[in-house]
Amino acid sequence: MIFIMTDAHAQSAQNIATTYDPTDIERKWYQIWEEKGYFKPSGQGDSFCIMIPPPNVTGSLHMGHGFNNAIMDALTRYNRMMGKNTLWQPGTDHAGIATQMVVERQLAAQNISRHDLGREQFIDKVWEWKEQSGGTITKQIRRLGSSVDWSRERFTMDDGLSNAVKEVFVKLHEDGLIYRGKRLVNWDPKLQTALSDLEVESVEEKGSLWHFKYFFEDKSLKTQDGHDFLVVATTRPETLLGDTAVAVHPEDERYAHLIGKNIVLPITGRLVPIVADEYVEKDFGTGCVKITPAHDFNDYDLGKRHDLPIINIFNKNAEVLAEFEYIAKAGEQISDAIAAPADYVGLERFAARKKLVAQAEAEGWLDQIQPYDLKAPRGDRSGVIVEPLLTDQWYVKIAPLAQPAIEAVQDGRIKFVPEQYTNMYMAWMNNIQDWCISRQLWWGHRIPAWYDAEGNVYVGRNEEEVRAKNNLAADLALQQDEDVLDTWFSSGLWTFSTLGWTGDAKKDAENYFLNTFHPTDVLVTGFDIIFFWVARMIMMTMHFMKNEDGTPQVPFKTVYVHGLVRDGEGQKMSKSKGNVLDPLDLIDGIDLESLVQKRTFGLMNPKQAEKIEKATRKEFPEGINSYGTDAVRFTFCALANTGRDIKFDLKRVEGYRNFCNKIWNATRFVLMNVEGQTVAQEARPELWELPEQWIMSRLQKAEQAVHQAFATYRLDLAAQTIYDFIWNEYCDWYVELTKPVLNDAEVSEERKAEVRRVLLAVMEASLRLAHPLMPYLTEEIWQTLAPMIGKGGDTIMTAKYPVPEAAKMNEQAEADMQWLQGLIGAVRNIRGEMGLGNARLLPVLLQNISDSERTQIERIQPLFKALAKVESITFLAQGEEPPLSSSSVVGHASVFVPMKGLIDPKAELGRLQKDLDKVQKQHDQIASKLANEGFVAKAPAAVVEGEKVKLAEFADQLVKIKQSMEQIAAL
């Protein structure tokens, strides 16, 4: 059955603009999608849920966000089209330290500190800043085409989430899992807050190793080499003032007779013992280590083992205290004060270092100074060296929470993709330490604890509850804890707090969203925050969320871990390197001057600006073109491999922008060839020839491969399959194969109508197949094309995702087509090798062809002739000698193109001789370079390898040119 194209359909080609311009398309469709509510859950089918990893509320989009969002949106759109009740929920993080730093910098520019304003006014300023800049990143997420349900957008400081944070803190405290203690923490003297281990970066730096003489209390004691002192090496001379022991290895015979004896600590005159501990490396330095439990984590642990006192010498600015704080042993409170050496009081730690070394040299107890490569612990935000400092902090007791989280991964309730990250997670979880959750900031969730004048601590959801629970007198003055919670504490509750969890069992049981969408299906994240966030989410969720049978509920079933986006050279993208790319600059384009200004503005080290400007001008002489959202998204998906590093190459974006153009132009061609013509209303497989059988089979295989790719989180394979099918099979082959059919007066109208239907149907299915990866282009074309075959709808977003049909898979058709493609390819290769040009029709001789193959070729002879640009096909008998020809072999078949009369031998030989001379010269230059031992020794290995590859390519070209010359000379 067929139908005549209506007038509306006759306008189809005009509906698609001549050239593909993504800008207008993108703005139009996102607004429609959002206004019509297509991003909201449908309420039908099985649930599918992803929670967006909350970006910093005052931040802006970077390549990692772009990559992450492209993957999440592809997964969401795929599951929505598969009929799932889909929720992709957005939100932002208050980002304690980062946001407070930004606002403090703004105030500093006006010579105002947060202390000048006071806590309440400062927090008001932060909220103002959040309102001003907080929408930037959500606007940018929209530009990426992200189909998140904006009606459910959350912020970690929303009332509901803040109440959930208090509820969790109070319950963990009631369960004995939150405690307050004086412990050693990473203290950031610039930001004036404790940092977790994960917020400290080890930076390789050039330093020194100072060797000092510590003299024995007993003047009669001697070392094996006759000295009355030990030589102790340290990278931190200033902490000498807080030493409480010198440690040696118990099996170090050099010092066995000294264990238990005392040395006199320089400057202070205090006596400190010599202790034996296996922590000491016998072969490092002198084998003697100074122990400062208050200012070194390893020393703190060693001090606990030996019941050493702890002497804190620094205040929170990392300046020497007037009175050192003395603690008899770890875990106890300050019991005494020791007067500091007067000359050192108030000195910043590095000034104290300089003074101490000078004093040691002047007094003769400096032994030597050696250059030393060290790893300096620096705060990841401030960049300053952190100071191990003894402070009162709040901690989560992790061990009881960690065990269920370990078991959930071991028994498969949570699966890591790729699998390799399971081991990374396990290694960390099995060695996990208690979590310091207090931060000395003002912006964030204030710790729900109150103190009376005597230092008693009361924990509760609010002050009223605290007073009622503890029967406190109304006139008893209470002061709330000044600290806030680590940002990762609130984001650790992200999957359930954002769905409205209250901690009230009755309310939570009636919460549709909580019961429908939790546990969520997949968390998409970079490997760099597995510990920061993923592990903590698992622990917190499993403690508070329970299944109906009371067993712990996981936050998500799968953790899809992707690599970090780096530049084309594999370098980390950073402002200081000047290699950062903004996804929106790739989408919209940016001129060179704006790009230079963007990359050089606000550098920590302004001296880098010139170098960055030069590199930018070299790499992007014309600035960056506008590629559109679909090309950028498709690139991200195509790069989503299982490795830890994702090298982002702008050439890939350019290639996928060309892919968008290819789809656009192919659609226009198809529409122009069907408008005003008859198109079959229903499939007529009995009218299919090899091309239709083949393309329909290949479509099923593509659909099958894409489903498998989504199931295994291999979006790179999904992108590759879609690209190969649409470009290489549909556009390059099937569309070309239809041209001679539709232009042939001998072909029946019925068959032509069916070919037009197949052209449209395969493109329509391809658009649905590609939609999760490139939503805008596919929606725009689908709206015009789908109604032409009775498949229209409000939006492609809710159209059914293509599902492979086994009945349409045809292995024989695929094998036959592969063989035909090989024959056509052989003729094209001969044409190219002999420089015959595309305009000339060639005579072709075929040999070693079976009867069935001959029948197949004769049946599709018009297609073969049209695609290979052949004037005649002649079949040679077995053993028949062909005339002098250029030849190729396809399977068992031989393809010949007789050369006589096709070329001017003399002119062609002259041309080839010039090519030969040119290639020979290039070959010899590289061969000479590689024969130079100096070049091979000094050049980077990659450069040498690249030259070897070039040499091999030139050698191959020489062989081919000579073969062509021999063939032509024989004519």
Curated annotation (Swiss-Prot):
CDD domains: Anticodon_Ia_Val, ValRS_core
GO molecular function, a single term: valine-tRNA ligase activity
Short motif ('HIGH' region): ranges: 55-65
Keywords assigned: Aminoacyl-tRNA synthetase, ATP-binding, Coiled coil, Cytoplasm, Ligase, Nucleotide-binding, Protein biosynthesis
Taxonomic superkingdom: Bacteria
Keyword Repeat set for record: no
Subcellular location: Cytoplasm
EC number: 6.1.1.9
'KMSKS' region (motif): residue ranges: 572-576
Catalysis performed (reactions): tRNA(Val) + L-valine + ATP = L-valyl-tRNA(Val) + AMP + diphosphate
Matching InterPro entries: aa-tRNA-synth_I_CS, aa-tRNA-synth_Ia, Anticodon_Ia_Val, M/V/L/I-tRNA-synth_anticd-bd, Rossmann-like_a/b/a_fold, tRNA-bd_arm, tRNAsynth_Ia_anticodon-bd, Val-tRNA_synth_C_sf
BP term (GO), one: valyl-tRNA aminoacylation
Top enzyme category: ligase
Binding site for ATP: K575
Annotated Gene Ontology cellular component terms: cytosol
Coiled coil region boundaries: 906-933
Entries under PANTHER family matching the protein: VALINE--TRNA LIGASE, CHLOROPLASTIC_MITOCHONDRIAL 2 (PTHR11946:SF93), VALYL-TRNA SYNTHETASES (PTHR11946)
Domains: entry comment: ValRS has two distinct active sites: one for aminoacylation and one for editing. The misactivated threonine is translocated from the active site to the editing site.
Record note on quaternary structure: Monomer.
HAMAP family: Val_tRNA_synth_type1
Family listed: Belongs to the class-I aminoacyl-tRNA synthetase family. ValS type 1 subfamily.
Function: Catalyzes the attachment of valine to tRNA(Val). As ValRS can inadvertently accommodate and process structurally similar amino acids such as threonine, to avoid such errors, it has a 'posttransfer' editing activity that hydrolyzes mischarged Thr-tRNA(Val) in a tRNA-dependent manner.
Protein name: Valine--tRNA ligase
